[in-house]
Amino acid sequence: MAIAVSHRFSPSGDLPVEAGRYRLVASGACPWCRRVLIARRLLGLTEAIPVSWSYGKGADGYWELTGPDGEPGVDPALGARSLAEVYEKTPGYTPPPTVPALVDTTTGQVVSDDSGDLLFDLSTAWWDLHREGAPDLYPLNRRNSTDAWDEWIGSQINVGHAVATHSKDPEKAAAAANGVLVGFDVIDTLLARATRMEASREDGLTMLDGPALSAIVAIGQYLCGDKPTGSDIRLFTTVQSYEYGGRQHYPGGEAPSISFWPALARWFRALEGRSGWVGPEERSALGCCRP
């Protein structure tokens, strides 16, 4: 994280829930941002938390903001051209600035840059502002399972993919890439078993490869039963990045398409086709072909 303290909306946190007070700086190309963007849409918080879009790095090498015309320029709400300018107002900031970044417009400071915290807090602390019929992304009766999935997906898949595609150390990149592919084997096997498909990637896997038992026993059509949860969001955005360009940068050449894992592919395509899971900004950034 780029800030020393990432504040929380939880009961033990210090941020008040207030529509219109915060602004999310995000990029559709970033899987960490897409976590928050998906939750924001699914929960009906698009008006309560407006977005300032970044489409890439500027002359300073950091995320640049956009003007009213959608071109690089001064963001009218934040009064800055570069995200670095916003972070520089924030106590405890250490470069480089990162996205997503939640800005408190009353102070102009970044109050959270942790996508996992934002996903969880929007799901559990912003209840009063959720749309009618919004999904419960972190149901209490599944919390042990979502916690277990979040921990395993975070290290095995999310961080693994980032290291595989960005590390300058060939050995670290190769080890991380192998971990992601084994992780896909595990998830494909568990989804196949739960949905009565043939577990085509089961050979060679051990219990040590998978998540905790509290995650395994919950799996159904989705990771924690018959409805998507925050854990599905965490996995989905990395699978997106993998499928739409990331796999081409894996060590040793292009890694297999997600279709190599039939049950995982079915899970992914089902979510990709659901309303709210892919917004126009993400679709443009990823080059997705599905409407």
Which stretches of residues belong to each language-model region?
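C-terminal alpha-helical interaction module
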Residues: 1-291
